[in-house]
């Protein structure tokens, strides 16, 4: 294969992307309606988990209702500090569905770096894995305005709300802020990069076209979410 093969193939992609969804939550709900029993997520390991589209959408919907009932409002920021897990993905989609801005934080960062990102992003609530308790304990007292919620498993999230009411995510627009990704900060403090729902959906469609994904494709995620 020639070294410039990927560049040549990339230049063939049409960038006239037509979006059929109003936001990321709209994408999830419509795909769950179209493919309720199709496999959506597999989390291998000691606590092996699998979700169909409908199962995942149900948990996301329940968790979204909890986030709203807890007092969080559209455009509020929430930080997520997890290793790759179903809990991270449920909270990620749930937050986006109700118009929150997600601030994912690499759990391998130091307590000082985590504290800086929470403060800089003005995150109101911080969800974190119970495996990170010792790291979070070091910064809790100095972040008195933030609410910390430890999450052990997907069952914790399901138990947060028992409502079956379907969430209406129509109040979230394509141009609303969706995620703030912080850089590694190799030459200083990490810098936040803002992505909208439009950015996320356009990226997803571009990647899907680039790799020629089909309904039968499976993607292996190794890097931190």
Model-derived features: where do they sit?
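AMP-dependent adenylate-forming
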Residues: 4, 27-51
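Flexible, low-complexity linker/hinge segments
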Residues: 13-22, 156-177
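Conserved pre-ATP/AMP-binding loop-to-beta segment of ANL
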Residues: 36-39, 164-182, 189, 212-218
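Conserved AMP-binding/adenylate-forming
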Residues: 45, 49-50, 63-109
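Conserved AMP-binding A3 loop
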Residues: 50-54, 178-202
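Conserved structural elements of the adenylate-forming
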Residues: 57-63, 193-214, 219-223
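Structural core segment of the AMP-binding/adenylate-forming
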Residues: 69-70, 97-160, 167-170
């Amino acid at each position: 294969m020639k070294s410039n093969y990927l560049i040549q193939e990339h230049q063939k992609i049409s960038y006239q992307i037509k979006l059929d969804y109003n936001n990321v939550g709209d994408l999830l709900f419509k795909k769950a309606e179209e493919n309720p029993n199709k496999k959506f997520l597999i989390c291998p390991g000691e606590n092996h988990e699998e979700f169909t589209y409908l199962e995942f959408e149900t948990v996301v919907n329940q968790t979204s209702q909890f986030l709203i009932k807890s007092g969080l409002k559209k455009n509020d920021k929430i930080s997520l500090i997890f290793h790759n897990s179903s809990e991270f993905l449920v909270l990620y989609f749930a937050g986006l569905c109700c118009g929150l801005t997600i601030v994912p934080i690499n759990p391998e960062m130091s307590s000082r770096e985590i504290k800086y990102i929470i403060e800089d992003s003005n995150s109101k609530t911080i969800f974190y894995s119970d495996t990170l308790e010792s790291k979070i304990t070091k910064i809790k007292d100095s972040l008195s305005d933030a609410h910390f919620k430890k999450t052990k498993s997907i069952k914790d999230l399901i138990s947060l709300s028992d409502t079956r009411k379907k969430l209406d995510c129509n109040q979230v627009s394509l141009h609303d802020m969706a995620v703030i990704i912080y850089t590694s900060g190799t030459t200083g403090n990490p810098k936040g990069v803002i992505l909208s729902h439009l950015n996320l959906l356009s990226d997803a469609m571009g990647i899907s076209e680039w790799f020629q994904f089909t309904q039968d494709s499976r993607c292996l995620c190794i890097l931190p979410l």
